[in-house]
Amino acid sequence: GPGPHIIMDHLMEHSNVDFQWGNHDVVWMGAAAGSPLCILTVLKTTLAYNNVDTLERGYGIPLRCLEHYAEEYYAQSDLTRWMPHADPNATDVRPANLARVARMHKAVTVLMLKLEAEVIARNPDFEMQGRDYLRQIDYDAGTVRCGGKVYPLLDCDFPTVDPTAPERLLPREEDIIARLVRDFKGSEKLQKHVEFLFSQGSVYSCVNGNLLYHGAVPMDEDGQFTACLLYTSPSPRDYAAS
């Protein structure tokens, strides 16, 4: 939603605050730490909801280089499916501004898919090969394979994607990502907010015999917990309620 930086300012004034991190919290922490893929994920969500002010004014993160890049490659694109979910009470819902945001939204999504392809290829144990969408596309037929089925693409305009190596970044794209990493890591206010979020939060906590968590716990069809591969060892507090 709009103004998360304002909410964080208010929360930091309280003496007793704790968080159970959700997926968006973790992505923002990753972005502040300089993860390119987390940064692009944050940007995609921000642009999809026309919440650019949070980045540009709230955290002082300029998007000019991204805007120029999107204008160059997607100025003639059909942006119908990339238009942001505009709040009618937002400060700028002019068609020209919405088109600007839509171009950046598409540009960021393609960049994000390129980086996702690299991560999936480097980590076969994630078993996410089916989510490597750029490699699931038949660029000649204009279709994509998803969940074992083939669907027609609603947008086939990929001027920056090489079908033979879809994850490959253009030199300009590498430069844009490097600038975004620098600006996210260099935002003093963002770093302050994320440090507070990190120091006062956890993925879950056990309080009075209750497990507090955000999101969902994996279960099977019979309502039993499913086994999960963890990339860290359990801590003593995992057994606090047992």
Predicted region positions:
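Feature recognizes metal-dependent phosphohydrolase scaffolds
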Residues: G1-D238, S242
